[in-house]
């Protein structure tokens, strides 16, 4: 007798994307709907929290309805609801969590509060319905999680078991991209703008520093950011036109080198079977190319559509919690500063 498929409804509202998704058996994407607020926040040069939460309130229920419709299903066919519990913006997280609780109560469904960072890890194994399945995960593995708010190096020995090896001591990688983009007067968000500007640039034009911290798996990008600032100031003082393409390419190369070298070193140290690179910054072509050009380790990088925040990854992680009976009650609170290493 065939085993019953397990369908999870995922809800994501941790920052400036409102998203819902239906996932079957932890990996098959039946639907994934995202409403982005990027254009609304551009004039602020970053996410404005109060605006973000208001926009989530407007968008979230229609987004969930659309995700269910695209999956040709209803709440009656869903086995559990997974929602981002943290980390993220408190006002944004509450919107998703409260609606998830209401739906779970109304439909008598289990609810699972998922860590946003573990969601990014599980995005690496998702694939759309009707396409070729992605390879199953092999443990142990090292996951590099790089986004606007986080730069984390995680050792994962089995499902839902995480050991934080290191993280950023100052700016996250995505935050550094945004700040340098502003220095170069490039539009928000900084990641895509830097990548676009770097296309015709020389990555060796400026020898920006790489903070290769010894005896630690931590990262630091503040020195690199300061070096770009000083270079820009020096060029302006001497009335030279800013070589935007070269500056962008050189900065991007420095970030890529630091992330790549540290991750490969950790993979070698812990004798892992594969590497995952995930989070918004994993959409960067230079970073993707660096990892794909090495042959020592199998590498999983999600497709571009799953690098930025989405609900498919929340449902994907939620499936494994459901299978392990890691369920929450309706009284749980959101956790804006929730670290990933809560289960080791």
List PLM regions with ranges.
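Glycine-rich phosphate-binding loop plus the immediately following alpha-helix
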Residues: 157-202, 225-226, 230-233
């Amino acid at each position: 007798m065939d085993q019953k498929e397990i369908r999870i409804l995922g809800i994501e509202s941790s920052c400036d994307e409102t998203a819902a998704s239906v996932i079957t058996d932890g990996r098959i994407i039946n639907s994934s709907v995202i409403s982005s607020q990027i254009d609304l926040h551009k004039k602020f040069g970053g996410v404005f929290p109060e605006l973000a939460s208001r926009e989530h309130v407007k968008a979230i229920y229609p987004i969930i309805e659309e995700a269910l419709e695209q999956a040709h299903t209803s709440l009656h066919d869903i086995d559990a609801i997974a929602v981002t519990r943290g980390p993220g913006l408190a006002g944004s997280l509450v919107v998703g969590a409260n609606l998830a609780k209401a739906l779970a109560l109304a439909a008598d469904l289990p609810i699972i509060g998922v860590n946003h960072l573990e969601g990014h890890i599980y995005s690496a194994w998702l694939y759309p319905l009707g396409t070729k399945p992605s390879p199953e995960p092999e443990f142990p593995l090292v996951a590099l999680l790089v986004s606007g708010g986080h730069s984390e190096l995680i050792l994962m020995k089995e499902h839902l078991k995480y050991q934080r090896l290191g993280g950023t001591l100052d700016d996250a990688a995505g935050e550094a991209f945004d700040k340098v983009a502003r220095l170069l007067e490039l539009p928000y968000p900084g990641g895509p703008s830097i990548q676009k500007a770097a296309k015709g640039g020389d990555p060796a034009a400026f020898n920006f520093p790489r903070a290769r911290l010894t005896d630690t798996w931590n990262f630091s990008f503040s020195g690199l950011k300061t070096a770009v600032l000083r270079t820009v100031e020096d060029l302006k003082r001497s009335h030279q036109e800013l070589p935007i393409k070269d500056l962008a390419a050189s900065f991007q190369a420095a970030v890529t080198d630091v992330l790549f070298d540290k991750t490969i070193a950790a993979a070698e140290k812990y004798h892992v079977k594969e590497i995952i690179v995930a989070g918004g910054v994993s959409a960067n072509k230079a970073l993707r190319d660096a990892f794909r050009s090495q042959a020592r380790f199998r590498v999983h990088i999600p497709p571009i559509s799953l690098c930025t925040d989405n609900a498919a990854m929340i449902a994907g992680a939620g499936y494994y919690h459901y299978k392990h009976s890691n369920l929450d009650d309706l009284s749980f609170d959101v956790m804006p500063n929730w670290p990933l290493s809560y289960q080791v």
